[in-house]
């Protein structure tokens, strides 16, 4: 109650586009933004709906007109609320041979449709239904419940207004949206930032400041911490999962085992088909899944599928890992049957489209080239090479010529073949077992004799000798990782000690590694270390230590890291 209120000088209206450029090694992209009133303004309800009408990952204007039509490499948009001024942002990445100005014009054309009312009015109701579902899903977690209080506090909103938001949104009309868009999303009232590849011609050098190490005070406690620690609270009694009592299993048909857990919290369902095969078995699986998402059937176009799924507040996705693949359908439980019918119909009856496939191949090759310009992506590829070895990379990666040689028939056959394999079904939702079994029988049509798939796991590389692996990247900072695998197998009895060690030593911002490397010595932007627990009973433990730091601090950072790893600082209070 004694906190000062936020006061700020109002900004001058933007009457002509504000144009800025930034340069760097990463791939080119463009972002545009319009200034909106602060989070407490009554129009904020409209801005969030407009953001989802423009882009929602399924059936928004950008989704269907740009991404689904493959007119850009990728594009998105959203409203971002802040206490003083909020913003409405749209952004995109260019295809091969496409200029940033062309991407800009495509984005501006989609925003213009909001001003002109050139969108389906049904999107408003669908957006509100999806917003309700997202709230229900988020409220399954205490973090999300708490953060709503935090955002309300930060924006200075009355809590009664916060909880009545859905009621207000349900009264918003298409004309309200058109009026709002004309008021705030003017054709000239935006700022635009071009991210271009290359060296900044106006780059300015800043002298590196001298950093004086500080003595950590992890054994000291503030009055605030002491007050919290001495407060009386009701002890939390842990509840451990009993897989025989807390969930159930049944067989939908031979070769299809269902793991079932009833959702007692809300009306949201999640249904996942899990196949024990992935990119180690077939590196083209992800391309096949991506291709399918652009296709329609003889009854529904791809746009109709996306719009219908969004209208019933459901979604679906297909993805492949190294050793497992997933087909997931989720959303409002009352619409599960309809969603399953749409997804299963697409899987069984997708109509090939060679133009889409050629565009998809070109976009994948462009995305690969862009990834090579990104330091984090390059470092991630180096990590996989270090941990899994060159054979793993070859098995799980399509070369560009192999990618170009794949046909529609081959890709769709891969998905069809997958549905002829044994798999698990995971269900979490409000329906009872009998209803789930009936839904699977009605919509999950499979052959009577499914082929078995053996469960496999990726093999980690042992570290029999010291090696250094380097990926050159011309940047002012570096990413450094140590990896050690002595072949020690999973031991259930050691699990508590390992978890405790990781929490104390290197698992977060309040650990020895972060405090010593960043806070005390100023030698890293980020640092962590842990003993990784295997993901399967036959897997190996392996040790990993990571530093992100400036190039000129590398030697000192590595030496300090080795010192605290080999001679771990001890603090009884921190422990």
Predicted segments, located by residue:
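Proteostasis/folding factors centered on peptidyl-prolyl cis-trans isomerases
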Residues: 73-75, 174, 183, 247-251
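Bilobed periplasmic-binding protein-like "clamshell/Venus-flytrap" ligand-binding domains
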Residues: 176-195
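Charged, well-ordered internal alpha-helical segments
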Residues: 172-182, 408, 442
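M16 family metallopeptidases and their MPP-like homologs
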Residues: 27-38, 63-170, 191-195, 203-205, ...
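Alpha-helical scaffold elements lining the catalytic groove of polysaccharide deacetylases
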Residues: 403-406, 411
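His/Glu-rich zincin catalytic helix
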Residues: 1-65, 77, 104, 193-308, ...
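Peptidyl-prolyl cis-trans isomerase
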Residues: 172-175, 349-358, 406
């Amino acid at each position: 109650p004694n906190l000062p209120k936020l006061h700020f000088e109002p900004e001058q209206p933007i009457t002509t586009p504000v144009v800025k450029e930034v340069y760097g090694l990463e791939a080119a992209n463009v972002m545009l933004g319009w200034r909106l009133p602060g989070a407490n303004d009554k129009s904020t309800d409209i801005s969030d709906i407009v953001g989802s009408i423009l882009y929602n990952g399924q059936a928004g204007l950008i989704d269907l007109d740009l991404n689904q039509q493959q007119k850009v490499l990728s594009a998105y948009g959203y409203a971002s609320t802040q206490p003083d001024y909020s913003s409405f942002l749209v952004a995109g990445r260019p295809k091969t041979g496409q200029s940033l100005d062309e991407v800009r014009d495509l984005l501006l054309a989609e925003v213009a449709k909001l001003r002109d009312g050139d969108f389906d009015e049904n999107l408003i109701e669908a957006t509100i239904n999806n917003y309700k579902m997202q709230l229900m899903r988020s409220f399954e977690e205490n973090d999300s419940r708490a953060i709503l209080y935090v955002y309300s506090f930060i924006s200075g909103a009355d809590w009664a207004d916060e909880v009545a938001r859905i009621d207000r949104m349900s009264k918003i009309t298409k004309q309200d949206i058109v009026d709002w868009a004309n008021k705030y999303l003017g054709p000239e009232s935006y700022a635009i930032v071009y991210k271009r590849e290359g060296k900044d011609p106006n780059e300015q050098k800043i002298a590196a400041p001298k950093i004086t190490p500080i003595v950590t005070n992890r054994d000291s406690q503030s009055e605030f911490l002491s007050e919290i620690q001495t407060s009386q609270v009701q002890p939390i009694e842990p509840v451990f999962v009993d897989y025989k009592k807390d969930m159930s299993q049944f067989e939908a048909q031979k070769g299809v085992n269902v793991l079932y857990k009833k959702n007692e919290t809300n009306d949201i369902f999640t249904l996942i088909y899990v196949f024990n095969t992935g990119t180690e078995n077939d590196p083209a699986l992800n391309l096949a899944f991506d291709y399918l998402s652009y296709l329609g059937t003889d009854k529904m176009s791809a746009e109709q599928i996306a719009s219908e799924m969004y209208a019933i507040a459901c979604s679906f996705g297909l993805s492949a890992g190294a050793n497992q693949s997933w087909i997931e359908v989720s959303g409002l439980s009352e619409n599960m049957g309809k969603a399953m019918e749409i997804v299963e119909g697409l899987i069984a009856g997708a109509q090939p489209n060679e133009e889409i496939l050629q565009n998809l191949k070109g976009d994948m090759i462009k995305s690969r080239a862009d990834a090579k310009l990104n330091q984090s992506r390059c470092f991630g590829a180096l990590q996989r090479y270090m941990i899994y070895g060159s054979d793993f990379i070859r098995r799980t990666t399509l070369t560009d010529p192999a990618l170009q040689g794949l046909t529609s028939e081959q890709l769709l056959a891969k998905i069809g073949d997958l549905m002829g394999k044994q798999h698990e079904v995971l269900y979490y939702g409000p329906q009872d077992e009998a209803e789930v079994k009936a839904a699977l029988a009605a919509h999950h049509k499979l052959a009577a004799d499914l082929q078995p798939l053996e469960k496999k796991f990726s093999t980690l590389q042992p570290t029999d000798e010291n090696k250094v692996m380097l990926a050159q990247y011309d940047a002012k900072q570096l990413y450094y990782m140590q990896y050690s695998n002595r072949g020690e197998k999973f031991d259930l009895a050691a699990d508590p000690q390992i978890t405790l060690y990781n929490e104390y030593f290197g698992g977060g911002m309040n650990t020895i590694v972060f405090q010593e490397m960043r806070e005390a010595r100023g030698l890293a932007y980020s640092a962590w270390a842990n003993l990784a627990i295997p993901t399967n009973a036959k897997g190996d433990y392996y040790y990993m230590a990571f530093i992100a730091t400036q190039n000129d601090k590398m030697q000192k950072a590595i030496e300090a890291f080795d010192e605290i790893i080999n001679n771990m600082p001890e603090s009884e209070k921190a422990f």
